């Protein structure tokens, strides 16, 4: 079907629905994949979003970046792997399901619901959200293998995870140990460091007196009073000076450097000792009456290099059951790991008086008890950064528990060396942020005391405590002596019922009841998505991955877990290139949250502007690695760009459809291409080259901004303006066809370049414009190869056109100064510059300047020849020298030719004034030169020169000016009648004899411009009549459609 005239306005929802239906009905995505099957492989791994709700703006941004880049790679000929992933296990989903089922604790889950039912509900919830989120991503136009995703609850995927744990065990990197770890009392499970969010929190800040003897105390500061029942020691730094300080009849032992800050100027230092001298000093536990077990324990001062002087007293409360550093130093000194707190954060019987209290609720009771015993020096509050559970937002606590760990500390060096093989965008993401995280990494707590997750494949013998790590479903079936799997279902509680026989003692082996940290789930995605080691061929084809991208929080999340798991399982990094992107924030830079009421949903944006506008905006707004502040007004600007693009498309199809333009019908050498035609072809290819480079480097902001500026500035505001009059030529004129061909080529190249970013509108334009003009072209724009031609780029022409556009803008400013309308022609414009490139550009593109500046003649020069130079005396230098001779010298200079005076100074270095035979010699500093333009000349400057515009209104100029004013009024009347572009009209004008005489010579010009078959000044009223005023002339214009051609 030939090119059809496009809809007059841009309707994104209509376009996007039509295009997505077209893709689905014609199976375009699968056919694009088939088309690229023989191309070089490009392997991409999708960071799996949680199936815990609907997508948000950040999730949309993430998938849009991925989709745009992968569409680009596909059009570059690559066979792209774009399998989506789904993270389906863990606390994010468990919490949502708990809310649905109305349960509040693990006890409720086990007693009221049952693990089997709870796990089933979690799976259903994940599946439902996966379907919803898939639909949302598809609405954004994201092309991925939605029918073949990797899902972390898939048995084949879980099996790869089991294999990874077996590899860790084989390498002696799997460890069960008692350690102090971060713990969520609400979820009753261990947390990894990556699962902790930090926020400001108010806590008690208390100074506690630990009794030594008599009225002497060790002064200790803490913000966690609830950990005092577990205190086993006080740590001091061996090299700090510690003071015995008297205040109010009591002696306090604390760091000398902090005495004045804590106790004030009134405190008196009695003596000072080194911290090392305090080692072994015993004290009585301040809560030994409330927590009786402490009466049977010895408490003493120990030494630790972790003690600082930045805050507190330099004497650090040490509870090995509640702090990682406390635990480590406690091991050195053989301190008991006393932890009187259960999994729910409630004090046990060992906590004495505080038994049954939630730890944070006990803070006030502990403070009151200390105060009543005169063991509290001061109680305040402090605001500080504190860790919260990433899902339920409960403040974390530290507990000593037995957990399973991966020995990351033993593979840290290998991880760092593998990191050097990865390209990071931006580079500092890997070189500083991620490297620092790895360098400070601790062993990874991988066990979770929950239900919906990959069961840890570790069976422990009930008799001899030996372990066996199962690496596959087949291995489990083979080793099982009791219980059996239901198909390949290896979730809890089914897998818990499988009993193995101990290979060492023949005893019964039961699975450890924990599930894996969900970061293990996603950390093994690189091979689990390929079902390795079960399916080795896929793995060899696609691993390792060429590209991944996620937000900057994943430096301690997915980027880290993949690298750690990759080194453990395969001795290498699973990815080669990483783009770390930012977060989406509101206009003020705040995190979006329902509580702030500042959440922008992707659907809201799509409803208002469509998916393509959202896609373009998110890539255009800022550098991808920076946080994105979502600004509705900026979105409007992007929407405006799409409307401008559509208007250009409407312009093109309106005239091309009228003339049944087919690019293949004409030999290029037969067409009359102008400089502006060659320029637009060069510009669009320059833009395509820059976009190619930008997308190759994942600089989406540069790519989109190049496209935006081209559409708005080059294509719409400039090229369409340059060729508009040529499209009105009625015959198959070579000049008009050259404009058509150039505009067609520019639009085709543009939509190919834009299509990875805004696939819907580009597909829609392609189907009409390109498929209409070239019926044998591929069925979808996304089947085209990437279009860019370096040979078509003419850098010199582009530079010259840039100069000419500045010249034309300067001409417009000069007209504004003279209040001289642009529709009125001027007699002459002189372009003045000392830069040869400027003059060369003006000469080369003189025709463009003449047409766009509406000038009869264009001249170029290094100076304006008609400028009058006026010489005046400089009072600052001549006043003191001339005194009474000043007035006659002034008159002589005024009478002299300023240009001659200036020439004399330049050639001879001075100018002589004859005062009745007396010669006065004037130096260059003695004379000031001013310039004066001739009447009717106005000038304006531009970078590189000036323009001088002659605004004299000759009869010929006035005749043409009035004719153009008449054309404008008739065009407005055509619009009022909503006439088609090609419609002919008859025009009758009632005016004064003077106006008729002035415009009669321009009759043919007016008729051509307004498509009039006849223009009559013998007035007859036609169908549509309107009164107008042009300058001081009152007119009546009447028009009607004409049947004449």
Swiss-Prot record:
UniProt KW keywords: Aminoacyl-tRNA synthetase, ATP-binding, Cytoplasm, Ligase, Metal-binding, Nucleotide-binding, Protein biosynthesis, Zinc
GO molecular function: aminoacyl-tRNA deacylase activity; ATP binding; isoleucine-tRNA ligase activity; tRNA binding; zinc ion binding
Cofactors demanded by this protein: Zn(2+)
Catalysed reactions, as listed in the record: tRNA(Ile) + L-isoleucine + ATP = L-isoleucyl-tRNA(Ile) + AMP + diphosphate
Chain positions of motif 'HIGH' region: 49-59
GO process terms (BP): isoleucyl-tRNA aminoacylation
Enzyme class label: ligase
Annotated Pfam families: Anticodon_1 (PF08264), DUF5915 (PF19302), tRNA-synt_1 (PF00133)
InterPro entries: aa-tRNA-synth_I_CS, aa-tRNA-synth_Ia, Anticodon_Ile_ABEc, Ile-tRNA-ligase, Ile-tRNA-ligase_type2, M/V/L/I-tRNA-synth_anticd-bd, Rossmann-like_a/b/a_fold, tRNAsynth_Ia_anticodon-bd
Protein purpose: Catalyzes the attachment of isoleucine to tRNA(Ile). As IleRS can inadvertently accommodate and process structurally similar amino acids such as valine, to avoid such errors it has two additional distinct tRNA(Ile)-dependent editing activities. One activity is designated as 'pretransfer' editing and involves the hydrolysis of activated Val-AMP. The other activity is designated 'posttransfer' editing and involves deacylation of mischarged Val-tRNA(Ile).
Free-text comment about domains: IleRS has two distinct active sites: one for aminoacylation and one for editing. The misactivated valine is translocated from the active site to the editing site, which sterically excludes the correctly activated isoleucine. The single editing site contains two valyl binding pockets, one specific for each substrate (Val-AMP or Val-tRNA(Ile)).
UniProt-recorded name of the protein: Isoleucine--tRNA ligase
Species per Swiss-Prot/TrEMBL record: Methanothermobacter marburgensis (strain ATCC BAA-927 / DSM 2133 / JCM 14651 / NBRC 100331 / OCM 82 / Marburg)
């Amino acid at each position: 079907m030939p090119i059809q005239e496009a809809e007059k306005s841009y309707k994104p929802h209509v376009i996007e629905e039509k295009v997505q239906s077209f893709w689905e009905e014609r199976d375009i995505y699968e056919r694009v994949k088939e088309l690229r099957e023989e191309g070089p492989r490009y392997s991409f791994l999708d960071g799996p979003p949680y199936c815990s709700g609907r997508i948000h703006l950040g999730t949309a941004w993430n998938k849009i970046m991925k989709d745009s880049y992968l569409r680009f790679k596909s059009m570059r000929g690559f066979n792209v792997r774009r399998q989506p992933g789904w993270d389906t296990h863990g606390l994010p989903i468990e919490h949502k399901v708990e809310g649905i089922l109305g349960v509040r604790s693990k006890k409720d889950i086990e007693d009221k619901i049952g693990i089997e039912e709870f796990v089933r509900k979690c799976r259903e919830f994940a599946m439902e959200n996966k379907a919803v989120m898939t639909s949302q991503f598809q609405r954004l136009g994201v092309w991925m293998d939605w029918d073949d995703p990797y899902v972390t609850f898939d048995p084949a995927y879980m099996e790869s995870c089991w294999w990874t744990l077996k590899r860790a065990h084989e390498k002696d990197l799997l460890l069960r140990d008692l350690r102090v770890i971060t713990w969520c009392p609400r979820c009753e499970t261990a947390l990894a460091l990556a699962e902790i969010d930090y926020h400001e929190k108010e806590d008690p800040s208390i100074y506690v007196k630990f009794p030594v003897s008599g009225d002497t105390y060790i002064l200790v500061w803490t913000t966690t009073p609830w950990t005092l029942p577990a205190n086993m020691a006080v740590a001091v730094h061996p090299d700090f000076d510690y003071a015995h300080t008297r205040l109010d009849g009591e002696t306090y032992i604390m760091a000398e450097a902090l005495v004045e800050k804590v106790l004030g100027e009134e405190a008196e230092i009695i003596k000072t000792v080194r911290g090392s001298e305090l080692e072994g000093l015993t004290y009585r536990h301040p809560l030994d009456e409330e927590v009786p077990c402490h009466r049977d324990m010895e408490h003493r001062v120990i030494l630790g290099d972790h003690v600082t002087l930045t805050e507190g007293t330099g004497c650090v409360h040490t509870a090995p059951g509640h702090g990682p550093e406390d635990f480590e130093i406690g091991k050195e000194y053989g301190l008991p790991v006393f932890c009187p707190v259960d999994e729910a954060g409630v004090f046990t019987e060992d906590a004495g008086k505080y038994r049954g209290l939630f730890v944070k609720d006990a803070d006030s009771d502990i403070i009151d008890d200390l105060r009543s015993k005169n063991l509290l020096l001061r109680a305040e509050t402090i605001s500080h950064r504190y860790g919260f559970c990433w899902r339920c937002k409960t403040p974390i606590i530290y507990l000593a528990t037995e957990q399973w760990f991966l020995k990351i500390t033993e593979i840290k060096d290998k991880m760092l060396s593998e990191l050097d093989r990865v390209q990071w965008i931006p580079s500092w993401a890997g070189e500083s942020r991620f490297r620092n995280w790895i360098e400070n990494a601790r062993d990874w707590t991988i066990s979770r005391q929950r239900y919906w997750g990959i069961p840890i494949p570790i069976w422990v013998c009930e008799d001899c405590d030996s372990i066996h790590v199962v690496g596959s479903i087949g291995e489990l079936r083979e080793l099982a002596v009791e219980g059996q799997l239901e198909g390949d279902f290896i979730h809890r509680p089914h897998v818990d019922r499988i009993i193995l026989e101990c290979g060492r003692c023949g005893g019964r082996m039961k699975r450890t009841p924990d599930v894996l940290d969900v970061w293990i789930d996603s950390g093994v995605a690189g091979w689990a998505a390929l079902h390795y080691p079960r399916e080795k061929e896929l793995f060899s084809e696609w691993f390792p991955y060429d590209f991944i991208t996620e937000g900057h929080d994943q430096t301690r999340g997915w980027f880290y877990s993949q690298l750690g798991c990759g080194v453990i399982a395969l001795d290498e990094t699973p990815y080669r290139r990483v783009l770390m992107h930012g977060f989406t924030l509101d206009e003020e830079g705040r995190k979006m949250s329902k509580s702030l009421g500042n959440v922008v949903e992707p659907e809201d944006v799509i409803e208002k502007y469509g998916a393509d506008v959202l896609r373009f905006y998110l890539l255009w707004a800022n550098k991808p690695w920076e946080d994105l502040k979502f600004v509705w007004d900026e979105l409007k600007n992007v929407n405006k760009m799409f409307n401008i693009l559509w208007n250009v498309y409407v312009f093109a199809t309106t005239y091309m459809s009228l003339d049944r333009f087919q690019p293949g019908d004409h030999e290029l050498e037969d067409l009359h291409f102008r400089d502006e035609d060659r320029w637009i072809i060069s510009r669009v290819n320059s833009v395509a080259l820059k976009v190619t480079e930008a997308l190759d480097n994942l600089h989406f902001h540069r790519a989109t901004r190049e496209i935006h500026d081209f559409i708005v500035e080059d294509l719409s505001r400039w090229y369409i303006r340059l060729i508009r009059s040529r499209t009105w030529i009625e015959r198959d004129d070579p000049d008009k066809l050259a404009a058509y061909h150039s505009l067609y080529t520019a639009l085709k190249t543009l939509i190919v370049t834009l299509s990875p970013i805004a696939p819907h509108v580009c597909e829609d334009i392609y189907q009409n414009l390109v498929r209409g003009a070239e019926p044998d072209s591929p069925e979808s724009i996304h089947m085209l190869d990437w279009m860019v031609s370096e040979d078509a780029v003419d850098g010199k022409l582009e530079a010259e056109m840039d100069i000419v556009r500045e010249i034309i803008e300067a001409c417009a400013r000069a007209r504004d100064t003279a209040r001289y309308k642009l529709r009125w022609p001027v007699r002459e414009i002189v372009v003045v510059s000392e830069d040869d490139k400027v003059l060369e550009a003006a000469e080369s593109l003189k025709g463009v300047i003449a047409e766009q500046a509406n000038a009869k003649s264009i001249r170029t020069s290094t100076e304006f020849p008609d400028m009058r130079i006026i010489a005046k005396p400089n009072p600052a230098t001549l006043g003191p020298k001339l005194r009474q001779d000043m007035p006659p010298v002034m008159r002589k200079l005024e009478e002299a030719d300023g240009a001659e005076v200036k020439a004399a100074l330049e050639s001879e270095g001075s100018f002589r004034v004859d005062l009745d035979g007396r010669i006065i010699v004037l130096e260059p500093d003695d004379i000031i030169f001013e310039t004066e333009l001739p009447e009717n000349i106005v000038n304006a400057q531009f970078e590189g020169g000036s323009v001088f515009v002659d605004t004299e209104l000759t009869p010929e100029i006035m005749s043409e000016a009035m004719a153009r004013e008449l054309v404008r009024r008739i065009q407005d009347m055509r619009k009022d009648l909503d006439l088609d572009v090609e419609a002919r009209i008859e025009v009758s004008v009632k005016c004064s004899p003077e106006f008729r005489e002035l415009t009669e010579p321009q009759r043919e010009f007016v008729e051509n411009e307004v498509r009039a078959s006849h223009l009559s000044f013998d007035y007859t009223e036609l169908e549509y009549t309107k009164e107008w005023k042009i300058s001081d002339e009152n007119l009546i214009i009447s028009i009607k459609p004409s049947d004449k051609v």
